Curated annotation (Swiss-Prot):
Record Pfam families: Seryl_tRNA_N, tRNA-synt_2b
Enzyme class per UniProt: ligase
Transmembrane stretches, start-end: none
Name assigned to this protein: Serine--tRNA ligase
Lineage of source species: Bacteria, Bacillati, Cyanobacteriota, Cyanophyceae, Synechococcales
Source domain of life: Bacteria
Residues annotated to bind L-serine: T233, A234, E235, E287, S385
Keywords: Aminoacyl-tRNA synthetase, ATP-binding, Cytoplasm, Ligase, Nucleotide-binding, Protein biosynthesis
UniProt record similarity statement: Belongs to the class-II aminoacyl-tRNA synthetase family. Type-1 seryl-tRNA synthetase subfamily.
Species of provenance: Synechococcus sp. (strain RCC307)
Domain topic, free-text comment: Consists of two distinct domains, a catalytic core and a N-terminal extension that is involved in tRNA binding.
Amino acid sequence: MLDQRLLRDNPELISQQLGRRGMEVDLTKLQLIAKQERDLEEQRSNLQAEGNRTGKEVGMLIKGGAAPDSDEVKALREKGNRIKQQVAVLEEEEKGLEAKLREQLLALPNLPSADAPEGKSEADNVEVKRWGEPRQGKDLEEHWQLADRLGLFETERSVRIAQSRFITLMGDGARLERALISFMLDLHSTKGYTEVMPPILVNSASLTGSGQLPKFAEESFRCADDDLWLTPTAEVPLTSLHRDEVIAVEQLPLKYAAYTPCFRREAGSYGRDTRGLIRLHQFNKVELYWFCHPEKSAEAHEQLTLDAEAVLEALELPYRRLELCTGDMGFSAARTYDLEVWLPGAGSYREISSCSTCGDFQARRSAIRFKEGKGTQLLHTLNGSGLAIGRTMAALLENGQQPDGSIQLPAALVPYFGRERLTPQ
């Protein structure tokens, strides 16, 4: 959430920075609500001060010998009661305006970092680096073709169980998924991450804190009878792990690695990636999350991205890093790197991780502060996939395919899977 002080002191900056995202925002209504709230706060404060003075006058009169039931004392007490009633009315009006202002502010995305490249769409994203040699070949198959021949997952039966865009992993497919999850969590634990297994049902406050609500409600699955949603990413529960808390500066940075199933409606993706593991309603992911000091967030962003890249390099998967332009960044992000893995069967790079620094945007929405010296201030949050499991499996299948129909697995994964190759079942 954006800082209300910025709205008051420099609304032009908000308009300018949101314009870099391609948004035209009229802040007039927001400014009016904010001014009304400040005016009410001033009125309430003045009335409370007057009420305090009235109370002191009553005390001085009685101390000076006036009877508690004298007309003068009664008049002052009646005045004090009227002031209390007026203050109560103003407090309710103030709460209503606060709620209105918060509702409006929650709908605005984060301001992009000054370092984020300008642009309108993914076509303006900037390639930062490449790693590995992309495999080329006319006869290379896509992962869903390989998986079908190897018997790694069921699609048609999954539609019967649920609906389209669900799969059931079978045999070596299920074992490979489990191996990848364990491998990733173990690798991240060596880099100082604390492993977390959070709830996958989260409440509205958690989704609001991370930035999914109110804007993206239609993209999430909601329980009909409770204020609970299936989490679209572990970023949501990890953000709220320290909601409404003050953390000692000595504890920072806090680094978490969490495996969760993730659930997304994928609204607007009709007809795209209808086969295989790329775009599903339910998928598994290992998420990396940092709470850090504001002065360390740029350094933390680079390290978080390197930690996600370390998984790809250990699995010998060629990839590239892109820096997203201002028009293509996510709602909560101030700056983002996307990692795209090479899929030789498809002949293209596909996103497998998005690593973002959110500044104090999520911390303000979730009231997460740190204590340094005598005061407290908002910390910074960062998140990134480390990695999406299904897309990693797709990349392993396409990059490891052999002429005999088997799949060669990378050496780092063999201790977890138990074999060097996948062969037709």
